[in-house]
Regions:
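Short, contiguous strand/loop micro-motifs
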Residues: 1, 36-37
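Polyanion-binding surface elements
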Residues: 1-14
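Generic signal for short, ordered secondary-structure residues
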Residues: 10, 32-33
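Short secondary-structure junctions
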Residues: 14-20
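Active-site beta-strand termini and strand-to-loop segments that position acidic
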Residues: 27-31
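C-terminal structural segments of small proteins and small subunits
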Residues: 33, 40-66
Length: 66
């Protein structure tokens, strides 16, 4: 999965961009901030980290929260 696709899923699931530190973005939802989410544009993200973040924050393939 491309890094930009993961970030689109976070936004679609209701997370709001809070701030960036270098190449890592932080999102916030219901007053809770996410851990740093790596952002490298169109580059492929490792499946392990992508799957970990999807499971941890409950985001399915369409960006909806489950």
């Amino acid at each position: 999965m491309k890094s930009s696709e993961l970030h689109r899923r976070f936004i679609k699931a209701g997370y709001k961009f809070d701030h960036a530190e270098g190449s890592h973005y932080f999102y916030i939802k219901d007053g809770v901030m996410t851990e740093p989410i790596p952002y490298h544009g169109a580059k492929e993200m490792g499946t392990g980290i992508a799957n970990k973040l999807i499971r941890k924050y409950g985001i399915d393939g369409e960006g909806e929260q489950f």
